[in-house]
Amino acid sequence: MKNNKGFTLIELLVVVAIIGILAAVGVVAYNGYTKSAKINAAKSNQGQVVKYLAAEIQKCNMGTEDTAMSGGLDCTVSNNASTISAAAETALADFKNPFTPSAAGVVDGANDDKGYTAMVPNDTDGEIVVTTRYDDDDSDASTEEVLSNTVQIE
């Protein structure tokens, strides 16, 4: 009698099928995790830009510093929203768009594209409106998918 050691073809096919099912489930879960991480990164950028603007404006208002925003903003003169927004864009050049990592994440001026944090200065009202579109999935029309904050220039 012949003694065969090894796996049968059926056993090998079952193992390959199980591995295929696990891989398919893993890819779907991984895509969900990466999308969620990008959305959270865009929201985090929004919060950091708003806090940075407020802190640097306050630094100038206190009069303890001659410059703010990594030296890009002269605190010894009166600055309007446009000047502050432009200085902030330069100071925050290291921020990247989570959805397009080769692009800058913070821009001076309106931009509704996904992942960009846009600073729109309003010199008349003395404010900078900071907005971020963190997703463009229109499957749920009831959600705006945009964060917006206003930073006052005092």
Q: What do the PLM-derived regions correspond to, one by one?
A:
Residues 55-154:
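Periplasmic/extracellular, small/polar-rich flexible segments of pilin-like filament-forming proteins
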